A protein has these predicted regions:
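Bacterial Sec-dependent N-terminal signal peptides
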Residues: 1-26
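Mature soluble domains of exported/periplasmic/lumenal proteins and thiol-rich metal-chelating peptides
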Residues: 24-115
Length: 115
């Protein structure tokens, strides 16, 4: 009986481990054009995306102004990610920057501003 129980527990742990592992394969990636200008913009966008449920990682390329976001589609979607960027004060593809978020940006991070 103990051997059967130990065998069942081993199978259970393996099945759970494989399920957790398989979840990583289902992550998606999206590239979003932003209105970011400087390293402060990059830091602000990446930091706020880190708090978005389901976002695994983000990286903003300042040269292209494109943020690449890896996310779990079961926990978030592209619309929520764009809304997060907008609320932070930046354009996100066709979604324009939220006025309140934009007003909070330092002048160097606003359109036409430079470091």
């Amino acid at each position: 009986m103990k051997k059967h129980l130990a065998g069942l527990l081993t199978l259970l742990f393996l099945a759970v481990g494989l399920t957790v592992q398989a979840g990583d394969d289902n992550d998606k990636e999206v590239k979003i054009k932003t209105s970011a200008i400087c390293s402060m913009c990059k830091e602000r966008i990446e930091r706020n995306l880190a708090f978005e449920k389901g976002v695994k990682e983000s990286n903003l390329d300042l040269k292209d102004k494109v943020v690449t976001v890896k996310y779990n589609p079961k926990k978030t979607d592209v619309a929520k990610i764009k809304a997060n960027i907008s609320k932070t004060g930046y354009d996100a593809d066709e979604v324009t920057a939220d006025e309140k978020g934009y007003a909070k940006l330092p002048s160097c991070c606003k359109k036409g501003g430079h470091h």
